[in-house]
Amino acid sequence: HPGSVFKPVVAVAALSEGVIDENYTFNDPGVITIDKYSYSNWYFTQYGSTEGTIGLTRAIARSTDTFFYKIGELTGIDDLVKWAKKFGFDKETKIDLPGEISGLVPSPEWKKRVKNEIWFLGNTYHVSIGQGDLSVTPIEENQAISAIASGGELCSPKIAAEPKCKNMDIKKDYIEIIKEGMIDACSTGGTGYTFFDFTPQVACKTGTAETNV
């Protein structure tokens, strides 16, 4: 599972589908409960604390799970899947190296076909923080984050050839707000503490996934 490094993709999806805007805020409850299931933020789980009212840049910097549960719910799994595939997930990148495999972006149709189970909101929550049945390869993740870094140009990674790039038609303002959140993640108060005093300034996104072994 990619874990929280997938959250910038979810942010692009939510902004591009118009379910949130740059000024959207969310009051972090620490944990969201649906029936008998609880979906918590890491900060609440570890320290019993909440983030208060936060916007998108802060949510990226602090990797606030509850924020991404909510915007993932607002976006809906169909559009999350659509945007994940736009970023190159669920298929090989065609890097010029042998042995590449693709990851998996789960959907309600996939779950019904493979597991004979229906899709629940909790499944959408898991995808929204890069967990559940979502799986990606390191090169897929590199390609996706590079698209954000380059201002919305998705380029096929190459070792010994010129990459082929295509514009993803993501609004520049959306790219910039996500970059700002990733810069804040590497700054004091963010989650990327190893980069707090790093020179030159960098942008990053931390991620810690849970998986059964």
Where are these regions (language model features)?
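Short, conserved phosphate/pyrophosphate- and ester-handling motifs at nucleotide-, phospho-/glycolipid
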Residues: K7
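Beta-lactam-recognizing serine transpeptidase/beta-lactamase-like catalytic domain environment
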Residues: H1-S4, V12-V213
